[in-house]
Every structure is written in structure tokens, then in C-alpha cells.
UniProtKB/Swiss-Prot annotation:
Pfam families: RemA-like. HAMAP family: RemA (MF_01503). Belongs to the RemA family. NCBIfam families: MtxBflmRegRemA, PRK04323.1. InterPro entries: RemA-like (IPR007169). PANTHER family: REGULATORY PROTEIN SSL2874-RELATED (PTHR38449:SF1), REGULATORY PROTEIN TM_1690-RELATED (PTHR38449). It comes from Thermoanaerobacter pseudethanolicus (strain ATCC 33223 / 39E). This is Putative regulatory protein Teth39_1325.
Length: 97
């Protein structure tokens, strides 16, 4: 199993294997989820002070805020041209040798 990483903006990278959902932060239920995660200490703000455009929910119940559009994150997830994935696979092959 190869590890696939996704760039969520400003040099921040997350594991695609842990991703559950990518949603827009506009709705009231998502705003509540963000606030609850903040209160529990499970919120990761990767916006660098910019406007939150995507909320990423992980299987570990962490909530990650990103300044990148949800569509962009999804496209990066579906892309077969991920440089990071290729790099990790090459590293794994070198370790096996």
C-alpha cells in the first residue's frame, strides 16, 4: 500500500488515506463542527490567516481548515500526477532493496 499525500495549500500536506470528507465551511452544521473541534483541541488551522474555503474531516476526528477550494483538494486527490506519491513510492522501493 502506497501512501498518498495531498497538498492542501501553503506547503501543508495531509494523508489521503485518513481523509473522510472535504466540505465547504458555509453551512451552520459545519460551523458547529469547527467550533466543537476547536473546543476539543482537534482543530488544525492550515489557512495561514486567509479565508477558510475547505473543511477537511479525517478518520481520527481531526478537523483541518484549508484556504484552498474543496474542488481543488478533490482534484488533487484524484490526480494521478501527484509528485509526492511518486517520490514516496521511489523511497519505498529503495528501502526494499
Amino acid at each position: 500500500m502506497s501512501i498518498k499525500l495531498i497538498n492542501i495549500g501553503f506547503g501543508n500536506i495531509i494523508s489521503a488515506n485518513r481523509l473522510v470528507a472535504i466540505v465547504s465551511p458555509e453551512s451552520a452544521p459545519i460551523k458547529r463542527i469547527i467550533q466543537e473541534a476547536k473546543n476539543r483541541g482537534m482543530l488544525i488551522d492550515a489557512t495561514y490567516g486567509r479565508r477558510t474555503r475547505a473543511v477537511i474531516i479525517t478518520d481520527s476526528d481531526h478537523i483541518i481548515l484549508s484556504a484552498v477550494q474543496p474542488e481543488t483538494v478533490a482534484n488533487r486527490l484524484n490526480s494521478n500526477k501527484e509528485i509526492l506519491e511518486d517520490t514516496l513510492e521511489e523511497d519505498e522501493e529503495e528501502e526494499e532493496e
